[in-house]
């Protein structure tokens, strides 16, 4: 009889918990009804990626072609093979849906609201053309374990779908490939300016979701992002600093109408790599010297594998095509050539300068920002991106001084932490052990940022993080790394 009572009581409690979860989801979705559409809300016993249900399967959104929505792939892109350690389970609410105001129907947003909340919110950008699940390994698992609520978005775009060479917006995967893809962000109504808009909109909606779930708004809000997501962080702190308390930019994309930018930096790599490969990867070849003088880090070769070769096959040309199709659409991508594209020449032949200026990073940040970048990044070379942005921040602060800004002690802090031998794709360390991971340093920088914002501690100075080292208050190498590569 006692077992019957216990079973009945257990069933009642389970039913009560299920009803409570449904009520919580219902109330939260009702609060977000004007901001989030087609939303799925679920109570999760574990919001970390230890739970297989946390990140949905690739191609799991109905009605979309393959590769348009690839969350499993997306979360692995920016994270090393050794993912963020997970030491606890975190129950809470997860919501995924569309941003209602988006006329294209592509803008998506993700919320993770842990039951054990620290009163703060993290807003995440997305790299490349990746989904709102891009930061699951690198950022979500890290900040959720500290009690942060987490919101992420997809820059207002889906990923891509397979197409043919006949598609005027098609981009081949690399110069040797016969596979063409169509990026959604090259469609009409998808200007790159939306990337900033949806980062800031995610912050606004995220704060509303937090207030609806916990009964109060977050007392602190931080922005984090990698690559194009790092660009989103920069632009967020430049355009809407009132929404944030600080940000971490992990190898963000630098955009300047005068240059450097991707349209100016990628063609020399595309043009010279085939001759370099034909030379047997000879570092003394003219082609290799051309890449180095353009600002690229030295190549690494292991057997038949080349670090430059990985970027040539996976990133350089397809990225140039994606940006050129959006920013300089009148250029004949493959008829005139990708490696021979000249940004300077195109300034007088098209509106590309104005289009790039509309999305440019200004350096005029309104809240503290830390950039973490690797010296061996061969997609966004450090001299052309991280260091260029640091110079832009310095120039913006200098301009404020010239205009008579007397409140200098309240200017937002900026730091550049360079990772010796760090690389854009952490997983490449599996092939080239000489490389160093960026993710641990980006996560450490996040902790340093929050400590500085919340407790007034000084951020460590700009520095080169030596191989095997960490960010320190008294760095052995302040400022820039002396060389882009340190062997063996």
Predicted regions, residues:
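Bacterial N-terminal signal peptides
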Residues: 4-15
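C-terminal His-loop and adjacent cap/lid subdomain of alpha/beta-hydrolase
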Residues: 22-488
């Amino acid at each position: 009889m006692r077992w019957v009572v216990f079973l009945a009581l257990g069933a009642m409690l389970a039913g009560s918990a299920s009803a409570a979860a449904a009520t919580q989801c219902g109330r939260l979705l009702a609060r977000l009804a004007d901001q989030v559409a087609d939303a799925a809300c679920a109570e999760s016993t574990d919001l970390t990626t230890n739970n297989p249900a946390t990140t949905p399967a690739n191609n799991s959104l109905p009605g979309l072609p393959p590769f348009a929505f690839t969350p499993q792939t997306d979360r692995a892109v920016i994270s090393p093979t050794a993912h963020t350690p997970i030491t606890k389970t975190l129950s809470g609410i997860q919501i995924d849906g569309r941003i209602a105001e988006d006329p294209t129907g592509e803008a998506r947003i993700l919320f993770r609201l842990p039951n054990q909340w620290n009163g703060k919110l993290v807003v995440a950008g997305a790299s490349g053309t990746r989904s709102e699940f891009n930061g699951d390994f690198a950022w979500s698992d890290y900040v959720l374990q500290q009690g942060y609520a987490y919101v992420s978005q997809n820059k207002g775009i889906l990923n891509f779908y397979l197409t043919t060479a006949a598609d005027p917006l098609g981009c081949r995967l690399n110069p040797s490939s016969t596979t063409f893809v169509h990026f959604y962000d090259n469609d009409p109504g998808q200007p790159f300016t939306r990337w900033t808009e949806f980062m800031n909109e995610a912050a606004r909606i995220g704060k509303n979701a937090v207030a609806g779930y916990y009964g109060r708004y977050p007392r602190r809000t931080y922005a984090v992002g990698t690559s194009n997501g790092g660009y989103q962080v920069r632009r967020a702190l430049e355009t809407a600093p009132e929404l944030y308390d600080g940000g971490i930019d992990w190898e963000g994309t630098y955009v300047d109408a005068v240059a450097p930018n991707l349209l100016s930096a990628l063609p020399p790599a595309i043009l010279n790599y085939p001759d370099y490969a034909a030379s047997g990867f000879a570092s003394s070849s003219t082609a290799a010297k051309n890449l180095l003088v353009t600002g690229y880090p030295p190549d690494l070769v292991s057997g038949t594998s080349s670090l430059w070769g990985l970027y040539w096959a996976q990133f350089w040309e397809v990225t140039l095509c994606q940006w050129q199709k959006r920013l300089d659409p009148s250029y004949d991508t493959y008829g005139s050539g990708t490696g021979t594209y000249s940004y300077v020449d195109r300034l007088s032949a098209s509106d590309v300068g104005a289009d790039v200026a509309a999305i440019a990073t200004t350096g005029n940040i309104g809240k503290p920002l830390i950039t973490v970048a690797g010296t061996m990044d061969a997609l966004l070379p450090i001299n052309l991106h991280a260091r260029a942005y640091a110079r832009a921040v310095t120039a913006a602060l200098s301009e404020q001084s010239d205009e008579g800004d007397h409140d200098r002690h309240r200017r937002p802090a900026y730091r550049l932490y360079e990772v010796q031998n760090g690389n854009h794709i952490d997983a490449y360390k599996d092939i080239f052990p000489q490389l160093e991971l960026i993710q641990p340093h980006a996560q450490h920088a996040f902790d340093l940022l929050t400590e500085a914002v919340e407790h007034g501690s000084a951020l460590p100075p700009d520095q080169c993080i030596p191989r095997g080292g960490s960010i320190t208050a008294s760095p052995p190498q302040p400022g820039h790394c002396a060389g882009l590569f340190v062997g063996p």
